[in-house]
């Protein structure tokens, strides 16, 4: 039995009629950029995130970069980032001219450890950039308190956690700005790249609107040096359709995660993901830690089960960041995770039969 890591076609087929209708509506309108679909989605997504303002952008990386720019983070500043994350978190910091300062994760959710964050603050620190990794919220209350105590901006990377909750509130509602990705494989995925920033600050939202459109509010009048980071109308229309199903899809992910937890709890050589009692994960990924990860991945692959590694190389050891001079051993927790983590298939369209095949195959190979 073949089990893909994520079945994007199944997501489309479930909503085919509504998605096709939304696309035809845009195509028939003749308005393909920053029109009524974007305006409607911004209002709907802001409300979903329990926030006041939403600004759509071209990608999750755009969302991070423009959030930092709008907050005044730039050349000579430092931004605290996780040592264990996707490189986009670091790239956004670099793109605005600041320096990423990595901090190791805590042991339950592998998100930023607040105690280590406080130790990493220097006079040059301008912002803290936590990632809600694998769908699990970072400890926003602790990080917000640290940011307030030191006069720092707090920008959430919510690329993997749309719909997750932190102490009952949606992630994205407890910071200066929160950046979302609508990459197709995300819990709320477009038909291509897309992103958004949510914030309670109207001035910050307007600044990001300016930056995303060449620094212009009025055609050919450019107030600042902006960029092109616009979301097209087709993507906004599709996201509006999918947003109505997001909570149901996340609930299906949670059910599958619970099934994995129950069936795999006694398997030797693996450690199951944990959650804090104050967190409701969006279960974007179901990530094991494995004593013999590469062997187990090969065994699953041979049985038709597609797995992925999030992430095989710590960012500080990537050639892109060789200039930081952080040799192997600099961040042992991130380096250990890179050698142990394995992501199993999980998604709203994974059948129980497919999940049971994953479970049986994993047990046989452990």
From Swiss-Prot:
GO cellular component: plasma membrane
InterPro entries named in the record: DegT/StrS_aminotransferase, PyrdxlP-dep_Trfase, PyrdxlP-dep_Trfase_major, PyrdxlP-dep_Trfase_small
Modified residues (N6-(pyridoxal phosphate)lysine): 186
Annotated stretches, region: Hydrophobic: 53-158
Domain of life: Bacteria
Name of the protein in question: Erythromycin biosynthesis sensory transduction protein EryC1
Lineage: Bacteria, Bacillati, Actinomycetota, Actinomycetes, Pseudonocardiales
PANTHER family linked: 3-OXO-GLUCOSE-6-PHOSPHATE:GLUTAMATE AMINOTRANSFERASE, TRANSAMINASE
A GO biological-process term: phosphorelay signal transduction system
Record localization: Cell membrane
Function: Sensor protein that transfers the signal of environmental stimuli to the regulatory region of target genes to activate or repress transcription of erythromycin biosynthesis genes.
Statement: the UniProt record of this protein carries the keyword rRNA-binding: no
Protein family per UniProt: Belongs to the DegT/DnrJ/EryC1 family.
